[in-house]
Regions:
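Vicinal oxygen chelate
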Residues: 1-2, 46, 92-130
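A short, acidic/glycine-rich surface segment
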Residues: 32-33, 42-43, 65-71, 104
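Exposed loop/turn and edge beta-strand positions of beta-sandwich/beta-sheet ligand-binding modules
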Residues: 5, 41-43, 77, 112
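Generic preference for hydrophobic
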Residues: 58-60, 128
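N-terminal beta-strand motif that seeds the catalytic metal site of vicinal oxygen chelate
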Residues: 1-18, 78-83
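Core segments of cupin and vicinal oxygen chelate
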Residues: 12-55, 97
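Mid-chain, well-packed structural core segment of small domains
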Residues: 71-77, 81-89
Length: 130
């Protein structure tokens, strides 16, 4: 078996409008599909970031009362989403101007590249990495 690539990552959010604003209007994801699922009385939002072979889709499912995410101590499962950027410092400046707090920039001990973390509206850790 040979897997070609990651096709998409799916996340559950507690506030659909807040998540849509964050991922589309602040982080710049493109909307691929937006569907109201009548049988579940909720929305599903498919987003894309990147081009060609570097593109990845993010599926957002709205759940009005999901259990809280366990961040500390870390639990099994998805730890964080990481995004490659050309310039971590410039990207952090843009995020801060939009009111998004970022952790201090540091060097990844393995790649020796600059990196930092910030969080989505539900507390999902997001990483920027050069």
């Amino acid at each position: 078996m040979k897997l070609a690539a990651i096709h998409h990552v799916a996340i559950i959010v507690s506030d659909y409008e807040k998540a849509r604003e964050f991922y589309v209007n602040k982080l710049g994801f493109a909307v691929v599909r937006e569907n109201f699922r009548k049988n579940r009385n909720d929305w599903k939002l498919d987003l894309r970031v990147g081009d060609g072979a570097d593109a990845i889709e993010l599926e957002i499912f709205a759940e009005p009362n999901p259990p809280e995410r366990v961040n500390r101590p870390e639990a099994c499962g998805l730890r964080h989403l990481a995004f490659r950027v050309e310039d971590v410092e410039a990207t952090v400046e843009e995020l801060v101007q939009m009111g998004i707090e970022c952790e201090p920039i540091r060097l990844d001990s393995y790649t020796k590249k600059k990196m930092t973390f910030f969080f989505d509206p539900d507390g999902l850790p997001l990483e920027l990495h050069e």
